[in-house]
From Swiss-Prot:
The lineage of its organism: Bacteria, Bacillati, Cyanobacteriota, Cyanophyceae, Gomontiellales. It is an enzyme of class 3 (hydrolase). The gene is comB. InterPro entries: ComB-like, ComB-like_sf. Keywords: Hydrolase, Magnesium. This is Probable 2-phosphosulfolactate phosphatase. It holds the Pfam family 2-ph_phosp. Its EC number is 3.1.3.71. Coiled coil: none annotated.
């Protein structure tokens, strides 16, 4: 097994496909995806284009359709929900399909959708993701951060490091053999430095500060928790994620 960490979708190499690819957007798309599926949502369907989302969701039964739209940390006008995991209660999302478009997370999922296995990961479901990968033993694993509009993000990197660290311990493979690139080693080092205080790291991150300015303090606390959800969001067909 080789693990490659890519800080943003733009860094994913062209012309090659990983056996297993993981999209990470801790603040907040993949955290919200995991939370919604754990709460009983039927599926999450992701879009980069809002007009396409609206057109596709219009074909779905209204009572089982939830439009999730976020731009710049705020709910898109006319949508049912923004990108907060706290909106994803069982009462609200059970048996529903969430049609989702966010600033960053949907881009990373679309960038890796041709991989054999595509997973959405966050800190909240880190161990479920790591256990699945350890069981499946894919030859190549990509962990792709969403970043912020093409730039690096601390929160996605530390989550990538958390997943890689779990696999490092589970497999017993030496780090120099498990890591496919320097970014993997750096991500693990970041996680080791902050694993006892992940909330502090998220509060220092530029997107964390952006959300704090929008009074999303509780979202940051929730998103900084590790291994609280035993759910594995897996791509069923391009752009559609279900609980495995």
């Amino acid at each position: 097994m080789k693990i490659f960490v890519y800080y943003t979708p733009e860094r994913v190499p062209d012309g090659t496909v990983a056996e297993c690819a993981i999209a990470v957007d801790v603040l907040r798309a993949t955290t919200t995806i995991a939370t919604a599926l754990a709460a009983g949502a039927e599926a999450i369907q992701v879009f980069s284009d809002l007009d396409k989302l609206i057109a596709t969701s219009a074909t779905w039964p209204a009572e089982r359709c939830i439009r999730v739209g976020e731009r710049g940390g705020k709910t898109v006008d006319g949508f049912d929900m923004g990108n907060s995991p706290f909106d994803c209660t069982p009462e609200r999302v059970k048996a529903c399909r969430l049609f989702m478009s966010t600033t960053n997370g949907t881009r990373s999922l679309q960038r890796i959708e041709s991989a054999k296995t595509v997973i959405a990961a966050a800190l909240v479901n880190r161990e479920a993701v790591a256990k699945f990968i350890y069981t499946q033993q894919p030859e190549t694993v990509w962990i792709v951060g969403s970043g912020w509009e093409g730039s690096y993000s601390l929160e996605d990197t530390v989550c990538a490091g958390a997943i890689a660290h779990s696999l490092l311990l589970a497999t017993g493979i030496p780090l120099e053999d498990l890591a496919g690139n320097d970014e993997t080693i750096a991500a693990i080092a970041l996680y080791r430095s902050y694993r006892e205080d992940l909330l502090s790291l998220l509060q220092q991150a530029s997107h964390g500060k952006r959300l704090l300015n929008l009074n999303c303090h509780e979202d940051l606390k929730y998103c900084s928790q590790t291994d609280i959800l035993d759910v594995l969001p897996v791509q069923q067909q391009p752009g559609v994620l279900v609980a495995h």
